Amino acid sequence: MRKVVLITGASSGIGLALCGRLLAEDDDLHLCLACRNLSKAGAVRDALLASHPSAEVSIVQMDVSNLQSVVRGAEEVKRRFQRLDYLYLNAGIMPNPQLNLKAFFCGIFSRNVIHMFSTAEGLLTQNDKITADGFQEVFETNLFGHFILIRELEPLLCHSDNPSQLIWTSSRNAKKSNFSLEDIQHAKGQEPYSSSKYATDLLNVALNRNFNQKGLYSSVTCPGVVMTNLTYGILPPFVWTLLLPVIWLLRFFAHAFTVTPYNGAEALVWLFHQKPESLNPLTKYLSGTTGLGTNYVKGQKMDVDEDTAEKFYKTLLELEKQVRITIQKSDHHS
């Protein structure tokens, strides 16, 4: 029986590289690509099947920044499959990133320069906006849409006889100081991306606490500094091209500069091969690339408090109740 893998954000960047790498590891998989743009997803599916003709690749339309789209997409997944073996929660945004020049010039002459470039800590601010659902866009896209997706797909994911895995694309940029239980959407702050990724780490801990006994395990990863649409929003592609020699040099000191989506997907692929029961739920798995170009995975203990994680999880459950009432009313009117 083919293992079924659902990947959000599968049509570009890390998600696209992950698809190719998983099929290279096991072309007997059924990959389900959850994407907003059907034509783009179709082109990806055709390319994957051309290189891996024995695989099965399907598409479900889903926009994780739109909760009705998430629910509709999940219903379609439940119609097609009886179980999911892997759910890669990879889709994400960093809208309108602004470089903090003061922090940049202060940091570049400090002893923390390598850490600053590896994590972008304090370097980037973003201008968030409100979605049609009434949420902060970064919070809904990076975290809450995925949370609703997990809740919708629980019947396909929870099988104690044969565990399923949730695998998140988080970030080294996840900082405790940018998250607050009083403002989980980071509406009052300027670093919603960092906040959403720290929230991802918290949710990961809570999901393991609440679902391991049901056969569902969750892990978080960081792809490192990768050239994707996300980073091209910070600086134009030609600037990154000019910086590549410097980045390759930095690799000898900081292995977070994975650069390519293929390298960045290393931890995501590594987790595909692990027994989830053997993994530490308080560890984030980091993709790394050495100065000589060798890829590897390193575990890093997360700066998370389990009680805070549980409180955050309960807050999300309350938010979910409100959302379901709104969606039911909308469906009734339509």
Swiss-Prot record:
TM ranges: 230-250
Active-site feature positions: Y193
Keywords: Endoplasmic reticulum, Glycoprotein, Lipid biosynthesis, Lipid metabolism, Membrane, NAD, NADP, Oxidoreductase, Steroid biosynthesis, Transmembrane, Transmembrane helix
Catalysed conversion reaction: 17beta-estradiol + NADP(+) = estrone + NADPH + H(+); a 3beta-hydroxysteroid + NADP(+) = a 3-oxosteroid + NADPH + H(+); 4alpha-methyl-5alpha-cholest-7-en-3beta-ol + NADP(+) = 4alpha-methyl-5alpha-cholest-7-en-3-one + NADPH + H(+); 4alpha-methyl-5alpha-cholest-8-en-3-one + NADPH + H(+) = 4alpha-methyl-5alpha-cholest-8-en-3beta-ol + NADP(+)
Localization, UniProt: Endoplasmic reticulum membrane
Binding positions for NAD(+) per the UniProt entry: T8, G9, A10, S11, S12, G13, I14, G15
Biochemical pathway: Steroid biosynthesis; estrogen biosynthesis; Steroid biosynthesis; zymosterol biosynthesis; zymosterol from lanosterol: step 5/6
Annotated GO MF terms: 3-beta-hydroxysteroid 3-dehydrogenase (NADP+) activity; 5-alpha-androstane-3-beta,17-beta-diol dehydrogenase (NADP+) activity; estradiol 17-beta-dehydrogenase [NAD(P)+] activity; prolactin receptor binding
Membrane topology reported for the UniProt record: Single-pass membrane protein
UniProt-listed GO biological process terms: androgen metabolic process; brain development; cell differentiation; cholesterol biosynthetic process; embryonic organ development; embryonic skeletal system development; estrogen biosynthetic process; hippocampus development
Positions bearing carbohydrate: N37, N178, N229
SUPFAM superfamilies cross-referenced by the UniProt entry: NAD(P)-binding Rossmann-fold domains
Post-translational modification: Phosphorylated.
Cytoplasmic-side positions: 251-334
Highest taxon above the source species: Eukaryota
One term under GO cellular component: endoplasmic reticulum
Coiled-coil zones: none
Binding site for substrate: S171
Short name of one Pfam family: adh_short
EC number(s) stated in the UniProt entry for this protein: 1.1.1.270, 1.1.1.210, 1.1.1.62
Tissue distribution: Most abundant in ovaries of pregnant animals.
Extracellular face residues: 1-229
Record's subunit section: Binds to the short form of prolactin receptor.
Record function comment: Bifunctional enzyme involved in steroid-hormone metabolism and cholesterol biosynthesis. Catalyzes the NADP(H)-dependent reduction of estrogens and androgens and regulates the biological potency of these steroids. Converts estrone (E1) to a more potent estrogen, 17beta-estradiol (E2). Converts dihydrotestosterone (DHT) to an inactive form. Also participates in the post-squalene cholesterol biosynthesis, as a 3-ketosteroid reductase.
Family annotation (PANTHER family): 3-KETO-STEROID REDUCTASE, 3-KETO-STEROID REDUCTASE_17-BETA-HYDROXYSTEROID DEHYDROGENASE 7
The protein's name in its UniProt record: 3-keto-steroid reductase/17-beta-hydroxysteroid dehydrogenase 7
Source organism: Rattus norvegicus (Rat)
